[in-house]
Amino acid sequence: MKGVATDIGTIHFIGIGGIGMSGIAEVMHNLGYKVQGSDVAESYVVEGLRKRGIAVMIGHKAENLGDAAVVVTSTAIKRGNPEVELALEKRVPVVRRAEMLAELMRLKSTVAIAGTHGKTTTTSMVAALLDAGGVDPTVINGGIINSYGSNARLGASDWMVVEADESDGSFLRLDGTIAVVTNIDPEHLDHYGSFDKVKDCFVEFVENVPFYGAALLCIDHPEVQAIIPRVRDRKVVTYGFSAQADVRGDNVTPIPGGNRFDVVVRNRDGDTRRIEGVTLPMPGRHNVQNALAAIGVALEMNISDAIIATGFAKFGGVKRRFTKVGEVPVGDGVATVIDDYGHHPVEIRAVLAAAREGARAKVIAVVQPHRFTRLRDLMTEFQTAFNDADTVYVAPVYAAGEAPIDGVDAAALVAGLKQRGHRSAQVIAGPEALAATLAATIAADDMVICLGAGDITKWAAGLSEAIAKETAR
């Protein structure tokens, strides 16, 4: 008799186009479950699911439910949704995304990556090293892994690598055999109520690791370092650039398109050894830090130093993580357009530092603030996050369903940037205005970085062509 049945009937995902939902749906489809779903709009994620044979309906209507035996909902789906209401009326089980992911994780040993920033990139780096080591893991990520062309993959081994989203506390359901915490910053306070509660939940996440597992913690981050004394009965391995790290980055050297660095590994007996010449095809010191987390995981899984040294060679990065999306011919050279998901001040600062590190001319930031509440709560931090940009263009706030807040808008951010000493910041109304402005000012070797979690990615995708059209007028 099979231990896990796949003939339970149709599993219906409400909000299947969300990056977290789509990964679970794809893996379950590949496991043999009958999967379908609905979403509010067409997207590249929806298109990808259909190509893989998963039916997706656009719009939320009760009739979409069909003969579903189980309903899975994303965090964005609330009571009152017609599909949820019909499922409850018919007594069809309704489970949250994290609960379904937790059920999948029961089938395998798991690496769970959590943290306020860097989860998606670190998850993809862990997958890359395990692939290089012949582990062939199942992967469910919060972003499209370029080498997969998807955010999910069903592997043949007993290991799974997952991104653990802390936004609503549901990551506490995800008990990793190996847990990673990249950083802890004050985010999602609308759910948690206070930063202390955020930190408490990360401690609980680490303590959920079994006695035979390990927690990889970034000692460079003060709030992560602060929770280490609270974890007294689990194996903790620290990583970072600190001299106290168990897995330490050393001799970091920027190279075209990325970094080369050494790793100093401290064993339990205090002895150390070096892994020299690790090449990472991603720019930015923060990405070396993410790579150190992945290396720590690989070491825990007994992947050899030789494989670790070369394991990132085929790493193609993650969609919308410092992704080059276009070039603009200018004079005898070109300007580059980059698309990045960064929407928190810490992320923006790291992305712009990486850009400055590799820039040969101006760094031009185009930011679309994401949510009025985030801009309100972190306004001071946003106003000091753009020092590495020569020029900042601030787009209207992407509301993400929120109502506007008086005095919290693009103009307020620009005013604050100028008050804190930024020499060039202005509001930009839309993609057409941006293209027209850049056409008159952009120069060879400039780097334009579009930042945000909203539809700024569409601005980035069409920007090089739009600038070219403006220039040709």
UniProtKB/Swiss-Prot annotation:
Report the principal subcellular site: cytoplasm
| GO cellular component, as recorded | cytoplasm
Family that this chain belongs to:
Belongs to the MurCDEF family.
GO-annotated biological processes: cell division; cell wall organization; peptidoglycan biosynthetic process; regulation of cell shape
Q: What is this protein called?
A: UDP-N-acetylmuramate--L-alanine ligase
Q: Which reaction does it catalyse?
A: UDP-N-acetyl-alpha-D-muramate + L-alanine + ATP = UDP-N-acetyl-alpha-D-muramoyl-L-alanine + ADP + phosphate + H(+)
The answer to whether keyword GTP-binding applies is no
Q: List keywords of the entry alphabetically.
A: ATP-binding, Cell cycle, Cell division, Cell shape, Cell wall biogenesis/degradation, Cytoplasm, Ligase, Nucleotide-binding, Peptidoglycan synthesis
The function of this protein is: Cell wall formation.
Q: What is its EC number?
A: 6.3.2.8
SUPFAM superfamilies assigned to the protein according to its UniProt record, in alphabetical order: MurCD N-terminal domain, MurD-like peptide ligases, catalytic domain, MurD-like peptide ligases, peptide-binding domain
Listed binding positions for ATP are: 115-121
| Name of the top EC class for this enzyme | ligase
Can you say where in the cell this protein is located? Cytoplasm
